[in-house]
A protein has these predicted regions:
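Gly/Pro/Ser/Thr-rich low-complexity, intrinsically disordered segments predominantly at protein N-termini
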Residues: 1-168
Length: 168
């Protein structure tokens, strides 16, 4: 289980500054930070939100032993990252909650929905960061709705939610 290091503490403290700023709370973007604590803004189009909603709905319906959450912040070695959707069991949630805010332990599944602003170099970096933070699987949804599943390596289907479709 990832622990809270000095670097993680700095990222968590910076994140608390950001979420406490009333001007930043009103931004219509996903907010993340890089390894220096600088704010990274990611605007997205409506299709992105539709895909997030579809993923959350499917997880509620077919992965009842856990619960999905949208835009969940995770403290990583490279700053605070915010997967579009996460899924975790109640047991993992207790563990996650014990690692600070934002947590240093990732939920079991982290999902990134790609937009025009993303490329595969960024996705591969996020897959690595989420896995290092404890995610068992990372799913990447391409703009056409194709879902790619990653654990140690890329896999054809999710092992945690085997009924999840390969396209949404």
């Amino acid at each position: 289980m990832p622990t809270t290091t000095t670097s993680a503490k700095k990222h968590q403290e910076r994140w608390q500054e950001i979420v406490s700023d009333p001007h930043l709370r009103e931004l219509p973007y996903t907010v993340e930070t890089n390894y220096r604590g600088q704010i990274v803004l990611s605007p997205h189009q409506a299709d992105h939100s539709y895909l997030q909603g579809d993923i959350i709905g499917f997880l509620y319906e077919h992965a009842k032993e856990g619960r999905p959450f949208p835009e969940f912040p995770i403290t990583t070695d490279e700053g605070v990252k915010v997967p579009d959707v996460v899924w975790m069991t109640a047991r993992r949630r207790e563990e996650v909650d014990g690692t600070g805010d934002p947590p240093t332990l990732a939920p079991e599944i982290c999902v990134e929905v790609m937009s025009e602003a993303n490329d595969w170099d960024e996705m591969e970096a996020k897959i690595d960061l989420y896995r290092k933070a404890g995610a068992e699987e990372v799913w990447v949804v391409e703009q056409d709705g194709t879902v790619r599943f990653f654990a140690e390596d890329e896999q054809e289907r999710s092992t945690l939610v085997p009924d999840f479709p390969t396209s949404v």
